[in-house]
Amino acid sequence: MSVWTTANNSGLETPTKSPITSSVPRAARSSAVITTGNHQQHHFQHVVAAAVAAATSVATGHQFQQQFPLHAHPHPQHHSNSPTGSGSNSNNSAGFQRTSISNSLLQFPPPPPPSSQNQAKPRGHHRTASSSMSQSGEDLHSPTYLSWRKLQLSRAKLKASSKTSALLSGFAMVAMVEVQLDHDTNVPPGMLIAFAICTTLLVAVHMLALMISTCILPNIETVCNLHSISLVHESPHERLHWYIETAWAFSTLLGLILFLLEIAILCWVKFYDLSPPAAWSACVVLIPVMIIFMAFAIHFYRSLVSHKYEVTVSGIRELEMLKEQMEQDHLEHHNNIRNNGMNYGASGDIV
């Protein structure tokens, strides 16, 4: 008769003949064969289970072994060629289990530590990042960004005032120099006095606006050309706000009104000796133009003030909503901390 025994610890079995002597009695031989068969069947089941576990661990750990290659030291395998020894079979199966377990442990290395990117960031990090990104437009209602917007508006006003004032004052000076008056003119003396006063006021107002623009604009241009919101406090536009508004009003409102009056008086002085109706016609045409100009100026300034008021109101509402949200978040955070403290105290972690 033949029984199955292990030839090595890799799970390969080879049938070997069990020698049976004729000197042993038949009953003893049958009991020995039954005992040996039971031991061999138990050993065969154990070896098959260990082989299946090793194959499963090798299949599942193949990907981890590619990512984390570990060079394990080979373990010496002990071969046993004993045909019937149960003790040697137990030792071989135990050695096979230890080798399989050690190989499976080497194939599954410990997971890497969590990276610093996945770790929790402190509470002040988000606030600092949001405040440092004001230049990109993410914090549009911060005091620094609002000051930067005022800086840009003041810069535009000063540029417009300087150009307008230089142009109109130059025209007034040329008109006063080029006008030709004779001693025997029929122009009323009052009209000549009005012409002199209007021309002087026109040049003085535009020169004042031009002086303010010329003095303040370089300091503002220096900060604007740096393109950095963090340097906005170095600009004098906040302290010199009233001077900038004065230059803007002198150049666009008062200066233009005086320029229209200058045209009417100049037409009267120039054409009165030649044709009095021509002088009166110039004044008649200029009256509706002056009315339209004044109406447009009033409407424009009212619209501008209304727009500023709406923007200010919307900004205040957003600030109120932001304040309420911050208070609600702070209250929720405080409640969570208190609840966690009560839970820890109840569990006995904190006494």
From Swiss-Prot:
Explain what the record says happens when changing residue 262 to Q: Impairs store-operated Ca(2+) influx
The annotated site for Confers selective permeability to Ca(2+) ions falls at: 178
Q: Which residues lie on this side of the membrane: Cytoplasmic?
A: 1-163, 213-248, 299-351
Q: What is its main location?
A: membrane
Extent of Polar residues compositional bias = 1-21, 94-106
Per the record, ranges on the Extracellular side are 182-191, 270-277
Gene Ontology CC entries for this record = calcium channel complex; membrane; plasma membrane
* Region described as Disordered: spans on this chain: 1-39, 71-141
- Pfam families (UniProt xref): Orai-1 (PF07856)
- Molecular-function annotations in GO: calcium channel activity; calcium channel regulator activity; identical protein binding; store-operated calcium channel activity
The record gives the effect of mutating residue 174 to A as: Constitutively permeable to Ca(2+) ions in the absence of Stim
Q: Which reaction does it catalyse?
A: Ca(2+)(in) = Ca(2+)(out)
Subcellular localization, per the record?
A: Cell membrane
The answer, when asked if Cytoplasm is one of the entry's keywords, is no
The annotated topology with respect to the bilayer is: Multi-pass membrane protein
Q: Which UniProt keywords apply?
A: Calcium, Calcium channel, Calcium transport, Cell membrane, Ion channel, Ion transport, Membrane, Transmembrane, Transmembrane helix, Transport
Q: Which Gene3D superfamilies match?
A: Calcium release-activated calcium channel protein Orai (1.20.140.140)
Q: Which GO terms describe its biological process?
A: calcium ion transmembrane transport; positive regulation of calcineurin-NFAT signaling cascade; positive regulation of calcium ion transport; store-operated calcium entry
Instruction: Give the family per the record.
Output: Belongs to the Orai family.
Q: What does this protein do?
A: Pore-forming subunit of inward rectifying Ca(2+) release-activated Ca(2+) (CRAC) channels. Assembles in hexameric CRAC channels that mediate Ca(2+) influx upon depletion of endoplasmic reticulum Ca(2+) store and channel activation by Ca(2+) sensor Stim, a process known as store-operated Ca(2+) entry (SOCE). Regulates transcription factor NFAT nuclear import.
Misc remark: In Greek mythology, the 'Orai' are the keepers of the gates of heaven: Eunomia (order or harmony), Dike (justice) and Eirene (peace).
Could you identify this protein by its name? Calcium release-activated calcium channel protein 1
Q: Which organism is it from?
A: Drosophila melanogaster (Fruit fly)
Gene assigned in the entry: Orai
